[in-house]
Structures are given as structure tokens and as C-alpha cells.
Amino acid sequence: AERGLLPAEATIVVAQPTALDPSRAPKGKAILWIQLQELPRDGQLRGDAAGRIEVPADGRWTPQVRDAYADRIIDRLCHHIPNLRQVIIGRHVIGPGDLPGLNINLVDGDPYSGSCALDQFMLWRPAGSMGGQATPVKRLWHIGASTHPGPGLGGMSGYLASRAIG
């Protein structure tokens, strides 16, 4: 992602929300949720590491790039789920170019709410002087991916804030 390339073999996160909540799909059906962790941000797309998908000169995620890359991911999953293509009855693909329209905090499609460099992560998130979830405003607490301990930790910042509040 840092080089602006579509990974030839992406890190893939797969979940089945209907395994815990069958009401999320029609009876007898299921949802397969797929998340890719390391894609170039919108406007920073420079090429395809596998050399198979053409990307626009402006580096933006187009529907064509998004869908072609989704096809690559499905092809890879088919190695582990042989009948996957035959059982797909619909799909909804959201790419980095779509994310800011869904959540204003996902600037340029960055799902991590900013840099995850060492000086912007863990105790230094959002700033070393902030002291975790506390803010300079009395009784205002900061939670979410932009705060300690960072993105991808399923509500941990809210848990830490609730413990600090008592």
C-alpha cells in the first residue's frame, strides 16, 4: 500500500456475520464479509503488483479497478472455498474511494484514521500529551480508531474510557 500498488496477494480478513446473527440474511442464506487490510489510499494508486489490472493515471479507485481487484480476491478465496463462485448470489464491493462517503473520518479511504507510524500509535495516539481518552475539555472523552490504543481493536478505546470514568 505504501508503494501505491495493488497487492498481488493481499491480506484477507473473512467473517460470517450470519453465523452469530442469522437474521442478517434471508432464511437459509449467509453473508461472507471480506476486508482487505493494506490497499493504497484513493489518489495514491500507482499500479498493480501482479501487472494485471490497469489503474488510472490520477491514482483514483474507479469502479472498474475496485471490481477487478474484488474478482482477484474471490479467485484466491476459491482455492480454500472451491464452490464459492457458484454460491454467490450477490455482492457489494466497497473500495477505498467509497469509504469517505460512508465515514468522514476515513480520509482518502484510509481505514485506520491516520498514520499508524510509531510516533502516531498506541500511547502517542492522538498525541502524547493527551493522556489516553481524556481531553482538555472537562467530561469529554475521545474514543475510536484515532485514539489509544489505535485502530482494529474492537472498542478498546471505549472500554479504556469507561474504566477511567469509573
What is the meaning of each model-derived region?
Residues 26-29, 46-49, 103-104, 114, ...:
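Surface-exposed beta-strand edges and their flanking turn/coil or helix-capping segments
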